[in-house]
């Protein structure tokens, strides 16, 4: 899945979360968070964890394909 990394980083800033704290909330490693943000993609299961860590639906963090 293509992830809207700008949206994720904005949400992290709004919530005052570091990537390390976010990773802990998501149940994945900080290194994985960094890789996902750098590449802008992840598996659907991981996208679910990322969204849950922010308390939002997956639709809010994925890029829409045209």
Predicted ranges, named:
Residues 1-21:
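A short, Lys/Arg-rich alpha-helix, primarily the initiator
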Residues 21, 32, 60:
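Residues in the helix-turn-helix
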Residues 22-23, 50:
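Short alpha-helical "recognition helix" segments of helix-turn-helix
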Residues 28-42:
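Recognition helix of helix-turn-helix/homeodomain-like DNA-binding domains
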Residues 39-52:
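Short, basic-rich loop-to-helix N-cap that marks the start of a DNA-contacting helix
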Residues 55-66:
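Short C-terminal boundary/hinge segments that cap the last helix of small helical domains
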């Amino acid at each position: 899945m293509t992830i809207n990394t700008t949206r994720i980083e904005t949400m992290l800033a709004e919530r005052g979360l570091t990537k390390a704290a976010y990773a802990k909330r998501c149940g994945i490693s900080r290194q994985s968070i960094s890789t996902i943000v750098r590449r802008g993609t992840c598996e659907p299961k991981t996208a679910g964890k990322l969204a849950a860590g922010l308390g939002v639906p997956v639709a809010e963090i994925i890029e829409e394909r045209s």
